[in-house]
From Swiss-Prot:
Transferase listed as a keyword: yes
Entry annotation: catalytic residues: 206 (proton acceptor)
Pathway: Carbohydrate degradation; glycolysis; D-glyceraldehyde 3-phosphate and glycerone phosphate from D-glucose: step 3/4
NCBIfam families: PFKA_PPi, PRK07085.1
Function comment: Catalyzes the phosphorylation of D-fructose 6-phosphate, the first committing step of glycolysis. Uses inorganic phosphate (PPi) as phosphoryl donor instead of ATP like common ATP-dependent phosphofructokinases (ATP-PFKs), which renders the reaction reversible, and can thus function both in glycolysis and gluconeogenesis. Consistently, PPi-PFK can replace the enzymes of both the forward (ATP-PFK) and reverse (fructose-bisphosphatase (FBPase)) reactions.
Residues that, per the record, bind diphosphate: 82
Known regulation of activity: Non-allosteric.
Species this chain originates from: Spirochaeta thermophila (strain ATCC 49972 / DSM 6192 / RI 19.B1)
Biological process annotations from GO: fructose 6-phosphate metabolic process; response to glucose
InterPro entries: ATP_PFK, PfpB_PPi_PFK, Phosphofructokinase_dom, PKF_sf
Protein's UniProt name: Pyrophosphate--fructose 6-phosphate 1-phosphotransferase
Amino acid sequence: MTRISPLQKARYGYVPKLPPVLQDEIARIQAELGQPTEAVADREDLKRLFANTYGKPIATLTRGSNPEAGRRRTVGVILSGGPAPGGHNVICGLFDALKKANRESTLIGFKGGPSGILDDEWIEFTDSLINQYRNTGGFDIIGSGRTKIETPEQFAKALENAKKHGLDALVIIGGDDSNTNAALLAEYFVQQGAPIQVIGIPKTIDGDLKNEYIEASFGFDTATKVYAELIGNIARDAISSRKYWHFIRLMGRSASHIALECALQTHPNVCIVSEEVREKNMTLSQIVDQIVDAVVKRAAKGENFGVVLVPEGLIEFIPEVGALIDELNTLLAKEAEVFNRIDDPRERISWVKGKLSGNNQHVFSSLPETIQAQLLMDRDPHGNVQVSRIETEKLLIEMVSSRLKALKEEGAYKGKFSALNHFFGYEARCAFPSNFDADYCYALGFTAFVLIANGLTGYIAAIKNLARPAVEWKPMGIPLTMMMNMEKRHGKMKPVIRKALVDLEGAPFKRFATQRDAWATESAYVFPGAIQYYGPDDVCNQPTMTLKLEQGLE
């Protein structure tokens, strides 16, 4: 028999908070539709690609009447991409809402991600199974995967298996790529005359699936709290031993939301924000200068220790390196067959050097061989460089160390520099969800079903007013096409949901920018400690600093 921890046992008893409108009978909740919407960019291209689902109105859930809510339904659900804390509660909320509307309705889960609907691997959810996963971390209830449904054969197979199960709707829980898939499936089903609704759920710990209506993706709250605890622990170790500089790489390939939130929570000496690097056209050398400046100033005060936060995707945001990666992605997509026949790593490097254009060839040649090799490792499923394999923090340590050595020889630096590197990634993906994520995810699952009960398809579930107590939350449905634009993938233009980057004019970054100079020279660390689930509201129910600052509550 599997043992469960006392905390897990206690969390089974936690009852997630719902906004008032979702506490009503499902038949008394209606979707109030607004005006037609437009995509964020590339509107004509997207109108052609989504001829049946483009331009839908925003749906706001309000009290009203929905006579169709109680009919018997079969709904499928898929967990897609990397795990994020709270995924199980989305499924629990979806299950509870569906059963509240009609006990005879059925929820089935496709196993292992989108491949589950293609291979027809599935389970039916029961009360006893659902109850084992309430308020727990992970995606293990059905597993996840990164398969993309993109070929005509895959779309046809997904439809065939959906019809086989008599699906009325399919809910896809995932990030920007997964929700792009949801939009494409919704369009395909309508095109084929199949009355199968598709609803997306915004998931990603990176925090880059957000906009005016999606205030946060689920998992971001928990993940940043886990990382902030670890950073705080390391900062406390730094001021205890007083001899190490800790370089910490954090998740966030496409945006620096995690690094920024963790900086606001812990006050490191240096935090690099990738978006600022790109905006200021900074070189790798200038980033090194910024870190060296902090090291030298702190050494002058006798403080040969510190904490540096580095976003996982930094290297792509350095314009000169970003241009290189863009060309590499295109080159290796076009010439994959030839490249894959070369086994020796050094021969691969030499072959690539010969294919790159002028400045990109120069930048590639200037990087240490270890970084060159990492840039040429296996692509991710979308054909891009696997940025998490690039150990940027080690590159920075090497370059900072070299610069300090030169300064010491000039007599401009008299301190000691001993660096340790860390990468925080998997540690947070399956953590017990914070109270915020437990509540938010349960409400998202509930919202998804109410959107289904109102006959909507091609929408993503959303909740507004997240920085305030759940009693003030407002559930909505946002048209997926509204968030899309065209981007180059595998060397071709494809419709995708636009990633949200750190807004350099936004309140979170501005707060950070006003304080970072003081943090660089002082040891002003804050120690958040572990996530708390019980106790006063200011200890266990606080949203992220990012949310509070964005909504003017901090």
